[in-house]
């Protein structure tokens, strides 16, 4: 008499969309939007393409969800840093220092996900990143305009240029100390132009 051992099938691995978005954020941040394929994403998530498209609609659909997650978890907290009870220049310097710290925090994903995404070749993805970037610029512009309306556009452009430069230098491997030195130089300019 032979005994048959019936093996019950294992429970299928559960797909967690929020975990997938976190994984995708790291992939997009470390490699850039253009360099990450749907095949890379499905492999990282452990799912097949139909499941990917059912969950996210498209690579762009996933990317927009990544940008929303980034805004909530990893973006520079402009609302907390741009305080009305402190000197304008000091708050802007704090934004730059926080940018420098965040841009080098993960050696595998340096720079700013949004600023780097604003340079991708895919037009809809680039527009999604730019929309996020423009919203951040508008917060800075509004903040500066409260005390320095005549300087708001110029200071917003200056901050955007500095943040893009910090992101590029972080991606090029510059240390936090080097980025902070640049922020200190920029801080001298900000304090001179915005003395409150």
How should each PLM-predicted stretch be described?
Residues 65, 78-110, 156-159:
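Hydrophobic alpha-helical connector segments
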Residues 91, 104-127:
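Amphipathic alpha-helical segments used for helix-helix packing
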Residues 75, 90, 94-97, 123-147, ...:
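Amphipathic alpha-helical packing segments from all-alpha helical-bundle domains
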Residues 110, 116-119, 151-172, 181-189:
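Hydrophobic alpha-helical segments that form the core
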Residues 1-15, 194-196:
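N-terminal intrinsically disordered/low-complexity leader segments
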Residues 68-74:
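Short, basic, alpha-helical segments at the C-terminal edge of helix-turn-helix-like DNA-binding modules
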Residues 19, 23-61, 65:
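Helix-turn-helix
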Residues 26, 30, 58, 84, ...:
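Conserved amphipathic alpha-helical interaction elements at protein-protein interfaces in regulatory
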């Amino acid at each position: 008499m032979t005994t048959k051992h019936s093996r019950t099938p294992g429970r299928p691995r559960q797909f967690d969309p929020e975990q997938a978005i976190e994984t995708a954020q790291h992939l997009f941040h470390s490699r850039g939007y253009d360099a990450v394929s749907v095949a890379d994403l499905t492999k990282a998530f452990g799912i097949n393409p139909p499941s990917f498209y059912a969950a996210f609609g498209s690579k762009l659909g996933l990317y927009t969800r990544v940008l929303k997650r980034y805004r909530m978890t990893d973006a520079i907290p402009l609302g907390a840093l741009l305080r009305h009870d402190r000197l304008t220049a000091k708050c802007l310097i704090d934004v730059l220092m926080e940018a420098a710290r965040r841009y080098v925090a993960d050696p595998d994903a340096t720079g700013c996900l949004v600023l780097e995404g604003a340079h991708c070749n895919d037009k809809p993805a680039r527009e999604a990143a730019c929309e996020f970037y423009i919203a951040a610029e508008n917060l800075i512009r509004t903040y500066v305009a409260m005390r320095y309306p005549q300087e708001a556009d110029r200071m917003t452009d200056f901050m955007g240029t500095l943040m893009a430069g910090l992101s590029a230098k972080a991606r090029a491997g510059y240390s936090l100390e080097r980025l902070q030195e640049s922020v200190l130089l920029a801080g001298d300019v900000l304090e001179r132009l915005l003395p409150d």
